[in-house]
């Protein structure tokens, strides 16, 4: 692969990544909400590592204004976040309190079983959080979709099957997150392996013949062929959206990016459109929220976790097209 400085909306087609995650140990507190607010205010601040800059740019100010508790927010990739959490807890010098984290498999295999994080579901909201989003706590769902340039190709996506991305015509013309940076891509490939039968059927539907495997299953076969076809890799999905949607291209690429990037059509005059492809239109990416073991401000962390699951705290994310909170009582 080349590097470039690179299912609830569609129920039967978006891969549900959270299905791959096993339950963790629940961590709860006994405060009433008023008691929790008082305890958090006494602590005075809360430190976060977060997958999104919106925590620092939008949530932090509103939270401090509402509760008088300062939020020290650092945007961070999952890989760095994992390293810091492990190092801080292992050394007994914990700086961070609450994390917003995308890498479910790492959470399930390392951070939770080895005691680096603790699950907390605000008891004041528990009836609004579906049971399959509580343990580990999912606070946000973000659909990632396959998209194309509607100015270049018109009303119809230039491919009908994902297998076409492995053909010579699309060599170097599929743009995606670097799997070494974005765990969601590895999770997508893992989910494809679990859904190999769908890939087999898609191949037969498109080409009219059976898929010949050189790997153990169709999921691995697809990943092998895709990697051989030189996809272009990026560090940020914003860059993918721009590369796909920029106007004036004769052979615009296809990409996978968060559905919310379609807001750039208006902001940046892009021409992004959804690909109606089989067997999957994209994936439904969960983001988890966990308290770090030994957090210096545990009550402020719990209050912030609660706030992010309320309408006011969730607005910076759920106000974006496609994203929605795990709190079923909120609008999206």
Per-range role (PLM):
Residues 282, 287-332:
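Mature extracytoplasmic/periplasmic domains
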Residues 49-60, 72-86, 94-245:
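Extracytoplasmic ligand-binding site segments that recognize negatively charged/polar headgroups
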Residues 2-14:
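Bacterial N-terminal signal peptides that target proteins for export
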Residues 127-128, 141-144, 220-226, 268-295:
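Periplasmic-binding protein-like
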Residues 23-26:
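N-terminal signal peptide c-region/cleavage motif recognized by signal peptidases
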Residues 105-110, 245, 250-272:
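A ligand-binding cleft/hinge motif common to bilobed small-molecule-binding domains
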Residues 39-41, 91-94, 111-112, 137-141, ...:
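Extracellular/periplasmic catalytic domains that process cell-envelope and extracellular macromolecules
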Residues 32-41, 49-70:
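Short, polar/charged alpha-helical segment
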């Amino acid at each position: 692969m080349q590097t470039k400085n690179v299912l609830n909306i569609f129920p039967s087609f978006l891969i549900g990544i959270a299905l791959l995650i096993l339950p963790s140990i629940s961590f709860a507190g006994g405060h009433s909400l008023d008691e929790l607010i008082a305890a958090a205010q006494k602590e005075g601040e809360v430190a976060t590592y977060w997958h999104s800059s919106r925590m620092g740019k939008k949530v932090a100010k509103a939270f401090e204004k509402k509760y008088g508790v300062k939020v020290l927010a650092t945007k961070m990739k999952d890989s760095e976040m994992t390293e810091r959490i492990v190092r801080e807890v292992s050394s007994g010098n914990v700086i961070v309190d609450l994390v917003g984290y995308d890498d479910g498999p790492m959470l399930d295999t390392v951070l939770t079983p080895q005691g680096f994080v603790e699950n907390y579901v605000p008891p004041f909201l528990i009836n609004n959080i579906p049971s399959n989003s509580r343990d580990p706590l999912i606070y946000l769902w973000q659909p990632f979709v396959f998209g194309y340039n509607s100015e270049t190709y018109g009303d119809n996506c230039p491919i009908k099957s994902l297998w076409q991305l492995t053909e010579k015509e699309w060599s170097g013309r599929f743009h995606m997150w670097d799997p070494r940076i974005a765990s969601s891509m590895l999770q997508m490939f893992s989910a494809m392996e679990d859904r190999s039968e769908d890939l087999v059927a898609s191949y037969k539907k498109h080409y009219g013949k059976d898929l010949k495997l050189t790997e153990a299953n169709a999921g691995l076969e697809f990943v092998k062929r895709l990697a051989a076809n030189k996809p272009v890799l990026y560090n940020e999905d914003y860059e993918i959206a721009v590369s796909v949607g920029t106007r004036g291209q004769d052979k615009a690429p296809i990409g996978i990016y968060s559905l919310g990037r379609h807001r750039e059509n208006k902001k940046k005059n892009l021409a992004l459109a959804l690909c109606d492809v089989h067997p999957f239109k994209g994936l439904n990416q969960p983001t988890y929220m966990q308290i770090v073991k030994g957090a210096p401000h545990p009550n402020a962390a719990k209050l912030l976790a609660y706030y992010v699951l309320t309408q006011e705290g969730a607005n910076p994310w759920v106000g974006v097209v496609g994203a929605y909170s795990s709190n079923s009582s909120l609008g999206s």
